[in-house]
Design a protein with these regions (language model features):
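Soluble "head" domains of membrane/secretory-pathway proteins
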Residues: 1-124
Length: 124
C-alpha cells in the first residue's frame, strides 16, 4: 500500500516493505522524522519519554541510541528518514544493520498479514 508513504502517513508500529542493498525487507517503524530514539534497559524511549511499546520490552536488544545508528549525524531523525526494527531479534536486517531508512527506498506499508494464520490481520 503506497498511500501512507505518498501522503506521509506512516506511523509507529507500521510494517513497511523497503529496498536496501538490492533486496526487499520488511520491518516495523519505531522512529519517524524529527524524533529522538533510544532503547535503554529493554525499554523504548521517544524524545526522552518512555513508550509503552511491546516491540522493545521483551527483546534481546538492551541498548541502542540513534547516534549509534549508521547514517545518523545526531540525536534526531532527519526529514525523510525512519528507524525500523524487525519483529525477530535474530534478523538484524533493519536499522541495526542498514541505519536510517530513506523514504525513497520504502515501497509501501503492509496492510494485510496472512501468515502465520493465527496472526491474520489487515489495515485500512
Amino acid at each position: 500500500n503506497k498511500i501512507k508513504v505518498t501522503f506521509d502517513l506512516l506511523d509507529h508500529g507500521d510494517i513497511i516493505m523497503y529496498r536496501q542493498d538490492g533486496r526487499v525487507h520488511f520491518s516495523r517503524i519505531i522512529g519517524k522524522p524529527g524524533e529522538s530514539i533510544e532503547i535503554r534497559n529493554h525499554h523504548l524511549y521517544r524524545d526522552d519519554r518512555r513508550v509503552n511499546d511491546k516491540y522493545a520490552k521483551h527483546r534481546q536488544i538492551n541498548n541502542i541510541a540513534l547516534r549509534d545508528i549508521k547514517n545518523s549525524d545526531g540525536d534526531t531523525i532527519p526529514p525523510g528518514s525512519y528507524v525500523v526494527l524487525n519483529d525477530k531479534d535474530s534478523d538484524k536486517s533493519d536499522s541495526r544493520r542498514y541505519g536510517l531508512i530513506d523514504k525513497k527506498n520504502i515501497i509501501g506499508d503492509v496492510s494485510l498479514k496472512y501468515y502465520p494464520f493465527k496472526e491474520f490481520a489487515y489495515q485500512f
